[in-house]
Amino acid sequence: LDRAAMAVATRNTGYPVVALVKQLTALAGPDAGRWTHWGATTQDIMDTAVVLQVRDGLALIEAELRATCTGLARMAAAHRDTVMAGRTHLQHALPVTFGYKVAVWLSPLLASLDALPRVRERALRLSFGGAAGTLASLGDQGLAVTRELAKELDLAEADIPWHVARDGLNEATCWLGILCGN
């Protein structure tokens, strides 16, 4: 693939898919090339690519989050009897233990870990509906193609095409915001 040509074309169209499909079609030749973009829209391809990136990113974040939680849990246990001054309104308060303080840091991170399966369920869905979201170009094979594509990409099938319904990706973004806020 000519990445430089793809970069120029992407700047012109705003979508890398157009240039990619053009090159893949040329590489596939006239017989196979006509099927390169069959059934899917540019939006389907872009959204599915984003979902694949989100999936990989969430896996990396989960690994780091689990390691952080493990470290904090160990620290909380190790310092469960280490007394320190509590703080309230930027002033000394009643004594607490450092282990308690660390457990307070740990608690919202564990809540984020608990929420992650639901975030994945909502965000990691295949986008595949075709031009109008009806899979019409695939005839009576639309649902079967969707099922196989979702299986191949290890993504959930969407109940309905989500070209304009961004809630799943929004939930993943909100989850990240909550995690970072903690």
Show which residues each predicted segment covers.
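TM-loop-TM module centered on a large, flexible mid-protein loop between adjacent transmembrane helices
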Residues: A144-L169
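A conserved active-site cap/scaffold subdomain adjacent to cofactor or substrate pockets
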Residues: G168-N182
